[in-house]
């Protein structure tokens, strides 16, 4: 993609009511290379269009964007590490990611589209594969709460449809967190500062801020 096209895309976003640090996003993408630039170019119109819709439509649009654009790969294949949490631009640059990367990309994108942080939580779960008798594995999803205490809607790289938690009996929450708190399961009892207790979350927050994805 040419620099002129990216500049036009960023100009459209910068003049929207939910403008963010487009200069930093553009520079960060250009430093990473053409794949990151192309990924940002594809994402920005989705964010801009989603910001003009209701929150349910934002969930659906952004969930579908990442599920269609990003190929699932384990961290060891993508990064040569057993567990690596990628920033949004890192994932867009690779075009690949695991469940944490999908959830993190959706989290920051929904924040940029205007969804309040209080409505979003990244949730570590045990996912039952292949039915009740199948094996379980560690997994991460993004949960959206329309109101405090409401049943959350689940955004998952395994299923493109956004479903209420009651329709995901295969998921057993372990703990959840966002930029403001850490909770056991999906409960309301705050268990502390997630930045202090989750070193990978601290790292990805810093990277997202450097890229312009985090205020």
Label each region the model flagged.
Residues 3-13:
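Bacterial N-terminal signal peptides
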Residues 15-215:
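A structural boundary/capping signal
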């Amino acid at each position: 993609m040419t620099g002129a096209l990216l500049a036009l895309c960023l100009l459209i976003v910068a003049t929207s009511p939910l403008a963010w640090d487009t200069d930093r996003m553009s520079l960060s993408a250009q430093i990473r290379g053409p794949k990151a630039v192309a990924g940002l170019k594809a994402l920005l119109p989705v964010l801009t269009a989603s910001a003009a819709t209701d929150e349910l439509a934002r969930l659906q649009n952004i969930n579908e964007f990442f599920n269609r654009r990003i190929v699932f790969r384990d961290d060891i294949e993508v990064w040569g590490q057993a567990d690596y949490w990628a920033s949004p631009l890192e994932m867009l640059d690779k075009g690949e990611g695991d469940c944490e990367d999908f959830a993190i990309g959706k989290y920051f994108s929904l924040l940029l589209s205007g969804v309040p942080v209080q409505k979003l939580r990244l949730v570590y779960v045990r996912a039952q594969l292949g039915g009740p008798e199948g094996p379980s594995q560690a997994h991460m999803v993004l949960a959206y709460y329309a109101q405090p205490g409401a049943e959350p809607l689940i955004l998952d790289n395994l299923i493109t449809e956004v479903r209420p938690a009651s329709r995901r009996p295969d998921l057993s929450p372990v703990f959840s967190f966002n930029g403001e708190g850490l909770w056991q399961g999906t409960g309301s009892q705050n268990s502390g500062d997630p930045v202090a207790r989750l070193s990978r979350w601290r790292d990805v927050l810093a990277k997202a801020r450097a890229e312009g994805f985090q205020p």
